[in-house]
Amino acid sequence: MNKITYLAGTAALSAMMAMFCGSEAHAQAKLQKQGTATQITVGGKPMLLLCGELSNSAATCEADIISVMRTCKERGLNTVLVPAQWDLIEPEEGKFDFSLPKTVIEQARKNDLKVIFLWFGAWKNSMSCYTPLWFKENTRKYPRAMTRRGKPLEIASAFSDNILQADKNAFSKLMKFISEADSSRNTVIMMQIENEIGMLEDARDYSDKAQKAFSSAVPEDLIKYIRSNGKKLHPHLLKMLTGSEKWTKDSHSAINNRLKKGATWAQVFGTDIYADEVFMAYYHAKYVEQLALEARRICDMPLYVNAALNSRGRKPGEYPSAGPLAHLVDLWHCAAPSIDILAPDIYDTGFKSWADQYKQPENPLFIPESRFCRNSGVRALYAFGEHDAIGFSPFDIDHGSADDHKSIKESYAMLEELSPLLLKYQGKGLTHGLLFDGNDRERVIVDGDITLTCRHNFTLPWDPRATDGSEWPEGGGIIIKLADMDYIIAGNGIVVEFATNSEKEQEEKKILGEDGFAQKGQNTDSQNGAQPKFKGMRAGIGYVDEVAINKDGTLKYLRRENGDQSHQGRHARISVGEYKILHVKLYKY
């Protein structure tokens, strides 16, 4: 069943929701499609989640919660990601304390914020550090994962039914608490199940039960999934099965040869660490699916799992292996179909590449953790503009420098203002995101007969920071096409030029001096008649206006950006450190 359709629910599910979640269950947060985009609706209305995730220990006492929620509101957030910790919720086996989640919900309402709870249950950053002491001490009942050489890890084994039942029981109690405390207010709008699941030291668990599972036949549901999705499999998995990352005429027979009846994991996927990771991904996902089904049974809302990424060239076992990583999406979609979103935690370089890997037709983009820095704001703009993101969230939002907070506050204010237009145009191929730095400086967008050449603002010669050796802060923004020859350009540190396609093809490259004019001697060929005759029409800028966006999506004129501010009609520009929304109207001549 399509997961997004599933959220709307069947009659039976609606009945359950009414029983557990109150008479206003129809207003629960849910996911819905608009074109190629997936939007989250809260109270029946779509919204952009402008989030921040609290540091891990920021919600462990009432006083801190009161303080941090007020701070989050002041910093421009509309949604806060908050840990819900098993060890504090069930400090004694069978005895539950929801005073902290209760305070979170109350303070969120007081500050007009939405909440996404993060279930720190059996695993947090691979480790089982948030399990209660009674769980930790009873390793016979709640066994640990083991390395190849028999060393126990502080990682609960995904193959233990006792662990699953204890984890699921506590999670179930949390979901019931939320359903009773928040049945009609929609304060809690999404749940994260576990946190950055994965294996460390070894790529898989070598405990007795894990070994037995690895020696057994590959489960039938995975066999069926592979057969049904052959051409759509991720290149990583396809290569493991066929030897090629691309589907060829021989791929079907290669897969059939692997998927013989009763074939074990080693026979289908091999015996290296990458095969180990595939095995663990399936069983991690299968475990999570049991918690997801419990959440659906009690109070339906969007569910996601987050991934610590396999960056810096690390191999399985060196990063938290077998989590919801981009190259393992097939295992997670197969074994955890009730999970709506596989979400990346992006801390390392390559933000655009990671975002691109996770925005897929079957997986909307939600970024629950991103490094909190002075570039956070423009990265948020890029995610919403380029990938129709559901939400963006810097981690450790309760800390950070003044520059970090200025970046996110300014960008979130801009996104809130842009939201009527973004929510209207998402999924229709009418929005683009921009993100530039000192190495990645330019992007060319072809929109019908118009070519938009977009660059970092420091590519212009007259800002001394562009050439004095300073590190370039990232520049970024959003382009929204309102109509032919009619655009919104919003962001910080970007410049956009417009040309017809034929004009762009005939473009003469010129190096500009610090005054913005061509350097000496660059017009010689043109003056001597050496250049071919220009053909076709050109695009001109009719006007560039700075505008505000009204709540109904109409534009409110603020001021005209002409003369030096548009380089005499050559471009639309937003300098580094500025946050503006520009309305650009073009014409042809």
Set out the residue ranges of the language-model regions:
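Bacterial N-terminal signal peptides
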Residues: 9-19
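The substrate-binding groove and active-site-proximal loops of carbohydrate-active enzymes
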Residues: 49-60, 83-101, 148-169, 267-285, ...
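C-terminal beta-sandwich/jelly-roll accessory domains of carbohydrate-active enzymes
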Residues: 465-471, 486-589
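Catalytic-core region of carbohydrate-active enzymes that cleave or remodel glycosidic bonds
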Residues: 288-301, 327-425
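N-terminal carbohydrate-binding accessory modules
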Residues: 27-78
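Aromatic- and carboxylate-lined catalytic core of secreted/periplasmic carbohydrate-active enzymes
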Residues: 381-504, 515-518
